[in-house]
Amino acid sequence: VPVIAVVSPYFSYGQPGSESSPTNIVSAGRGEFIYDNFIPHGYALAQVAVFATELSTGCFDYRGDGEGLGIHSAVEWLGTQDWSNGNVAIYGKSYEGATAWEAAAQGSEHLKTIVPISGTTALGPLLYKNGSAEARSQVMHSNYGGSILDYDNDDLDNLCGDVLEGFLAGPTRYGLGELDPYMDNYYDERSHIDKALGLYNGSIYWVQGLQDWNVDPHQVFGGPPGINWYQAYIDEGYEVAGMIGQWEHNYPDQWSK
């Protein structure tokens, strides 16, 4: 059967007693739409926790190569199981839309389509644009610290090098702007849409709200000077479709929120 995967840092997210659902439970916040609408038609649903979140091991590498390789390994595993027909899709909103682009940038032959819903395509342009840094850039990496916390004595083991680098990179980008020494390494590593172009061999169904002030539409319709990523993928010969409308950082059926 074909597989639709949701790849997220948000499984079992939060303090004990109030955490979100784990990977073995389908909830309204993540895979329920896929479960209700695609499982009856012969698809499988996979819920995947990125490195160092929920029960996944490894170092939490916020949108970095480590995280991308972990996602790639999951796609390869899903595409090679006896019950799988080898075709994998990744679907999700916001961070879970970003993981779709991380997978695309790895170029797995099993990844056949991605459905990024308000998904980040490149971290640097999200946090720094038009000559200034967004205020959230200084704490963006810290915001995901809760993803790696189990609230027990093992939490210190999760403070690995990639996590500590992220804590430094955010305030540095905010304070130094274009003088940021991380510009050419940390943030280039976390730009996925440019790496996927020409390497990814699948289709794209882009879903984006034009009133989204969290993951701005320029993540889809912008790019380096002279580049419109949406058009660039069409021009490169990709099968591209889009659901674009006047909603915020939500799913399209939540347009009134």
Residue ranges and their predicted role:
Residues 91, 115-118, 207, 243-246:
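Alpha/beta-hydrolase-fold catalytic nucleophile elbow
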Residues 82-95:
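Alpha/beta-hydrolase fold nucleophile elbow
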Residues 92-102, 214:
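Glycine-rich nucleophile elbow surrounding the catalytic serine of serine-hydrolase chemistry
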Residues 200, 206-208, 212:
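Short beta-strand/loop motif that positions the catalytic acidic residue
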Residues 3-79:
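Cap/lid segment of the alpha/beta-hydrolase catalytic domain
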Residues 230-251:
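Catalytic histidine neighborhood in serine/cysteine hydrolases
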Residues 13-16, 20-24, 28-34, 40, ...:
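Accessory cap/linker subdomain of secreted extracellular hydrolases
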Residues 213-227:
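Conserved alpha/beta-hydrolase "acid-adjacent" motif
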